[in-house]
Amino acid sequence: MRYDLTIESMEWSYSRLTAFEDCPYLWLQRYIFRIRGQSKFFAQYGSLMHSIMQQYLTGVLTKNELVPYYLTHFLTEITGKAPTQKIYQSYMEQGRQYLKTLSFPARKILKVEDEMHFEFAGHPFTGFLDLMSEDEDGKLYITDHKSRALKPRSNRSKPTQSDVELDKYLRQLYIYAHAVHALYGRYPDYLEFNCFRTNTWICEPFSIERMQEVEEWARDLIDRITSESKWNAHLEFWFCKHLCDVAEECEYEDLL
């Protein structure tokens, strides 16, 4: 069944686009039937770390308060079950170590967790920009905090799987780069990931050509979603069991 009229009135986001790529049936449940999902371990962990960095960058928490706050709230807010006890312990320790030695680049902070509404690919979009900053030379950076352990670009003649994954996640920052230009009058000079679990900073120069490619990807994907009628489920064990927030309402989960 198609839901053209409902879909055409939507405000889009990077996560709304990638949810369809993850699983069309998940997208149907979440955005058409509005099933209230239940965040799982990885999502809860990412939300806690984002909240802590927001509070630190806005002066609500001091550096000395970060680890005690983190440990206290990890125990109370991370209620989802980790895939294994080893992963649970690893994530807890990686977060603790990161916050213990936290060090952001010395730049002027312009925006923190900035809610943006803008047009992209001919459609209304929204997004939350984790951090926008400017260095002493006036170069503008937009930064996204990521729990995923992305790797810096290899610069090999043939892109590695890690390079392909990096480009996939950079789509989000290119969407935000368009928003920054629309709202603040200039494109960022650099797109940046703060991969906090591994304490890895990945910085990529902005490319107008790449942004145009992302815009075309978004436009094509929205067209696909609008014309979708089958809404097939992508049954993949790890995703369904540990990442999908509507799995408990999904009749396909028992097939795994």
Describe each region flagged by the PLM.
Residues M1-L256:
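RecB-family 4Fe-4S metal-dependent nuclease core
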